[in-house]
Every structure is written in C-alpha cells, then in structure tokens.
Amino acid sequence: MVEKRIQPLARDAMAYVLAGGRGSRLKELTDRRAKPAVYFGGKARIIDFALSNALNSGIRRIGVATQYKAHSLIRHMQRGWNFFRPERNESFDILPASQRVSETQWYEGTADAVYQNIDIIEDYGVEYMVILAGDHVYKMDYEWMLQQHVDSGADVTIGCLEVPRMEATGFGVMHVNDKDEILAFVEKPADPPGIPDKPDFALASMGIYVFHTKFLLDALRRDAADPNSSRDFGKDIIPYIVQNGKAVAHRFAKSCVRSDFEHEPYWRDVGTIDAYWQANIDLTAIVPELDIYDKSWPIWTYAEITPPAKFVHDDEDRRGSATSSVVSGDCIISGASLNKSLLFTGVRANSFSKLEGAVILPNVKIGRRAQLKNVVIDHGVVIPEGLVVGEDPELDAKRFRRTESGICLITQPMIDKLDI
C-alpha cells in the first residue's frame, strides 16, 4: 500500500463545501432548511460529514457556500464549527450568496458559487482546492485523493464510486482507461460505460473534485466569460477539462475510512425520504454499515448540552423500553415502547405509545397510545393522542407524505389538518 507523505498535502489545501441546495426530493423535510442542514444519525446534520472529513484529513481552511433557506445551516455552523483559530493559520468561512458579482446575480450554479468568491480563495494562497458536496453521508480521508492528484499530474481529480452499471443512470459517469484517466464524462447516461477491470460496474461521480488552485481559478474565469455556460461543475467545468486537459478518477475505496466493523465503502446520498429513513434506521443494527462510534474518525457537530435520556414506568402494560434503537440525550420514554427506532434530542414519548421503524427529529412530543410505524417525524411536531400511522396505507396517504415503499413523512402542518 502506498504510504502518505511525511508532509501532508492537506496542510496546503482549502475545502470548499457547496451547501446551497434544497434537496427537493426530500419534500416537506426541506421546506424550512437546506438539505445539508437536515438532521442525521441522532445528533449531527448531513453537512457535518463533509466538514468532519475535511478536518480529520488535516485541512484547516474551509469555506461553505450557502443559498437556499440557509438560516438553520448557518446557525448550526456558527455554534458547532466555531473552533478554528486564525492565529493557527486556520479559517472557517460561511459564504452566503450575496450578489458579489452583480446586484441581480445570486449563485447560478455550483461553479458560480465558487467563482463569486475567487477573491477570498486567492487571499488564502493555498496550493490545492478540494471541492465538496455538503449533502452526502460518508467517511473519507481527502489526503489520499490529494496525493493521487499530485502524483498523476492531473488538472482535476474526481472522486468516484464503483456502482453496478445499470444503477449508474442517475449519476455523472466516467469512462476511464486502465490507468483511471478519464476519457469521457457522461451525465446520467442510458447505457453507462463499464470499468475496464470490472465491466459490470461503472464509475459514478461523487461530486468531489481536487484542483491546483491556479488551474481552478483560471477555469472558473473562462467559464464565467462563456454566455452559453450553465455555471456548473458537472455540466461545464468537468467536461471541458476532460476534452482539453487531463482528468483522473479517484476510486472511493482507496480513501474510504473504515473501522474494523465496516466491511464495504459506505456512501449515501439520502436524497429521498426512503433513502433518508433507511440510512438512519440502519444505524440501529447490531453492526451497522456506517460506524458513527469510530473515535479515530469522529463526526464533529454542535454538542448541545442536554441531560441524559430517561426511561420511566415498569408496569406490565406500561413500560418505558427500547430495543435495537438509538436514543439521544434529553429524551424521556415515559411508559412507551420503541423498536428499531432512532430518536434525536428532546423527544417525549408518552404512555402506551409504540414506535417501530421511527426516525424522530428533535423536540417531538408523542401523545399517549400513539402507534407509529415506518415514519419520519419532523422537528417539533406534536403527535396527538391515539394517532395510528402504518396500518392503513390509503388513510396514511391522504393524511401524510407516504412513499411507495410505505414510509410516512409527518410534519406539523399535516397534523394541524387532521380531523381527529
């Protein structure tokens, strides 16, 4: 195995996180927040994974571009990511869309979200730029990708996942040679090209790019001058470099961080209600696919000060209990029973209620005798006494956002419309 350099390249890199997207496939879950600000795993927000990867990789200069409904995201970062110190040559910049180029122009694409802050990037004088999406769940050491970028002499190095070929139709797909040099980049192809050594698999873009800073800024300026550009990395910047420069694929398996319990590289988009529910519920397994308890690669986040979780009542039909579940601080399970559920902070589950396959966001109150199965309940929802979800598909679909696989998203406006 190749060893890391004695002098890490991450020390001379800046991570630039694109966190302005809505995530419309999450429906009402992103009505009040951007997708990167959506809660995940009982404690964190989705963006904490990209930020933690950067920090754990040794990167100490980070910029985060925000746009859509950014208040909760900005507040979270101000509270949880305020420990960077300029006197140690560290920085953490929150970069909201602010019409820095013209009085009528917000961020018009992923590339434009970087271009509009070129002066800030130049001020830091870093050698390398690591462009990241702020809405994926994974653990990755970017130092390995930086090292491959330098060793290969590439103009851009693109993080890629190996996925079954016919599942790659929703991704940007790399056609590579046996050296993983990218010959073509195809956006959402009907017939994805296979990998030379694994023809039944394709290399799908993770939306992670490494550049030498000067090359990137020159490419952004050239793109900004093109009136036909959509100002997007995947649609404009990357295809141009593939055709006119040298682009190299970096396989995620080479830099994925895995504990002793994680056997396969883990990366999730969690961009749909089903995917979001499944990724959270997976954490309740005895040996989950994603190890969030790995102290060698912590997921940093805002550490809210809360009292411990509490379980009360021990009668035959009224026992506060949880099996195969994750329960966060400040939760009180008062005579309720949980199975295969994940609760964020401040949840109150009252007597005789039963939760199974439930993802409960912070500060939810669950009334007595509620029966909730396969649900995602948004922040602060008050579940009325006796509400039953998960038994009558037709009724659930009328009341809530129900997916084809039977997962129900419940928000307070939906509850307010109930006639019960």
UniProtKB/Swiss-Prot annotation:
It comes from Rhizobium etli (strain CIAT 652). CDD domains: ADP_Glucose_PP, LbH_G1P_AT_C. Alpha-D-glucose 1-phosphate binds at Y107, G172, E187, K188, S205. PROSITE patterns: ADP_GLC_PYROPHOSPH_1 (PS00808), ADP_GLC_PYROPHOSPH_2 (PS00809), ADP_GLC_PYROPHOSPH_3 (PS00810). This is Glucose-1-phosphate adenylyltransferase. It is an enzyme of class 2 (transferase). It comes from the Bacteria. Homotetramer. InterPro entries: ADP-Glc_PPase, ADP_Glu_pyroP_CS, GlgC_bac, GlmU/GlgC-like_hexapep, NTP_transferase_dom, Nucleotide-diphossugar_trans, Trimer_LpxA-like_sf. SUPFAM superfamilies: Nucleotide-diphospho-sugar transferases (SSF53448), Trimeric LpxA-like enzymes (SSF51161). Belongs to the bacterial/plant glucose-1-phosphate adenylyltransferase family. Keywords: ATP-binding, Carbohydrate metabolism, Glycogen biosynthesis, Glycogen metabolism, Nucleotide-binding, Nucleotidyltransferase, Transferase. The gene is glgC. Transmembrane segments: none annotated.
